């Protein structure tokens, strides 16, 4: 009821304004009685993933809480795990506004935010202040003005900063909104990056005396040869897991709708089939050896089960959560 009213109001406003308005209020009121408006008790459905003990297999995808300002509020909603970021070494403003558009006819969003965030030091301070004891993923990226040849330096910088504060780390090489970033998903560039990051991870494990799994987030816009190459590279470099998928550049599913031709990544219902296909292919190509978090177009029980049946160990929601609210978490967890 509360979310229906809130959504009705926010959907009359600019999409990014509504996003910031929601985050500001979640952050402001998380430790007050007003948090009862979104808090809910969700039955425990424990799952072990990469040695991490989760209360349930439904997580918040990266991109919603880029600066880790609302961890407490999202925990109150019942997420089994929360992923914050994408964060970069230095603060950056992102792309020009407007840069976020709703396609309500398809329960979808197009965004070209461009990794807008306040930088990794700010995120780490927010994580410390939250005192969150649940499972926290931290999603890392490179600054827009960092050349791809030096991209691994940005990822390593972020890894070092977040390592002791993260339950797992996600390497984002699949956002379509940082020029050239997706080129890191292919061939020698991918192997070079993953080898460097794996070596850094092993050094950090030795330094801090704790295991922090490293996952890679990939795009849905991969052809069969590319999916096979990515799978081989993830396995050969002993990457701990994969998140499939990010947003799509494909527009055929929303052709003719308002904002359909806006540049950026499309998320929500239209990416569901593509994301599920990538999950299924990853499962097949790796012989089930690679733990998978499925994300993309999950906005009800059947779409969550579809990802799990395709091979995902866990699921994440973002756009579906924007359209359906905290009740979506509860309905999915109850059904699993």
UniProtKB/Swiss-Prot annotation:
Q: How does it sit in the membrane?
A: Peripheral membrane protein
Q: Active-site residues?
A: 175 (nucleophile)
Q: Which Gene3D superfamilies match?
A: Aldolase class I
Which CDD domains does this chain map to?
DHOD_2_like (cd04738)
Q: What is its main location?
A: membrane
Q: Which cysteines are joined by disulfide bonds?
A: none
**How is the cofactor bound here?**
Binds 1 FMN per subunit.
Q: Where is the signal peptide?
A: none
Tell me which residues bind FMN: 62-66, 86, 139, 172, 217, 245, 268, 297, 318-319
Task: Report the locations given in the UniProt record.
Answer: Cell membrane
Naming one, the record's GO cellular component terms include: plasma membrane
Q: Which InterPro entries match?
A: Aldolase_TIM (IPR013785), DHO_dehydrogenase (IPR050074), Dihydroorotate_DH_1_2 (IPR012135), Dihydroorotate_DH_2 (IPR005719), Dihydroorotate_DH_cat (IPR005720), Dihydroorotate_DH_CS (IPR001295)
Keywords assigned by UniProt, alphabetized? Cell membrane, Flavoprotein, FMN, Membrane, Oxidoreductase, Pyrimidine biosynthesis
- Pathway(s) served: Pyrimidine metabolism; UMP biosynthesis via de novo pathway; orotate from (S)-dihydroorotate (quinone route): step 1/1
Q: What is its EC number?
A: 1.3.5.2
Q: Which GO terms describe its biological process?
A: 'de novo' pyrimidine nucleobase biosynthetic process; 'de novo' UMP biosynthetic process
Show the PROSITE patterns listed in the entry: DHODEHASE_1 (PS00911), DHODEHASE_2 (PS00912)
Keyword Transferase listed: no
Please name the GO terms that the record assigns under molecular function.
dihydroorotate dehydrogenase (quinone) activity
Needs which cofactor? FMN
Write out the similarity annotation: Belongs to the dihydroorotate dehydrogenase family. Type 2 subfamily.
How is this protein named in the record?
Dihydroorotate dehydrogenase (quinone)
What species is given as this protein's source? Pseudoalteromonas translucida (strain TAC 125)
């Amino acid at each position: 009821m509360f979310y229906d009213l809130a959504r009705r109001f926010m959907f009359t406003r600019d999409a990014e304004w509504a996003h910031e308005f929601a985050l500001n209020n979640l952050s402001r009121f998380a430790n007050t009685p007003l948090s009862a408006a979104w808090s809910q008790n969700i039955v425990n459905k424990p799952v072990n993933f990469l040695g991490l003990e989760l209360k349930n297999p439904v997580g918040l995808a990266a991109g919603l809480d880029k600066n880790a300002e609302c961890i407490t509020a999202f925990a109150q909603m019942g997420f089994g795990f929360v992923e914050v970021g994408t964060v970069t070494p230095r603060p950056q403003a992102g792309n020009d506004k407007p840069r976020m558009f709703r396609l309500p006819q398809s329960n979808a969003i197009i965004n070209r935010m461009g990794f807008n965030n306040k930088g990794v030091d700010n995120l780490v301070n927010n994580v410390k202040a939250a005192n969150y004891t649940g499972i926290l993923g931290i999603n890392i990226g490179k600054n827009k003005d960092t050349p791809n040849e030096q991209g691994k330096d940005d990822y390593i910088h972020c890894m070092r900063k977040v390592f002791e504060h993260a339950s797992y780390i996600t390497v984002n090489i699949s956002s379509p909104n940082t020029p050239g970033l997706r080129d890191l998903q292919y061939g020698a560039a991918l192997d070079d990056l993953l080898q460097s990051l794996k070596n850094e991870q092993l050094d950090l494990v030795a330094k801090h005396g704790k295991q922090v799994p490293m996952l890679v987030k990939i795009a849905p816009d991969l052809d069969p040869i590319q999916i096979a190459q990515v799978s081989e590279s993830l396995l050969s470099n002993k990457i701990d897991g994969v998140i499939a998928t990010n947003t799509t550049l494909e527009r055929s599913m929303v052709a003719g709708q308002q904002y359909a031709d806006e540049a950026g990544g499309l998320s929500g219902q239209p990416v569901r089939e593509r994301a599920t296909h990538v999950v299924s292919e990853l499962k097949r190509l790796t012989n089930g050896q690679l733990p998978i978090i499925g994300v993309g177009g999950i906005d009800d029980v059947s779409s969550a089960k579809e990802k799990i049946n395709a091979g995902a160990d866990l699921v994440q929601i973002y756009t579906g959560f924007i359209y359906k609210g905290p009740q979506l978490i509860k309905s999915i967890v109850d059904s699993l």
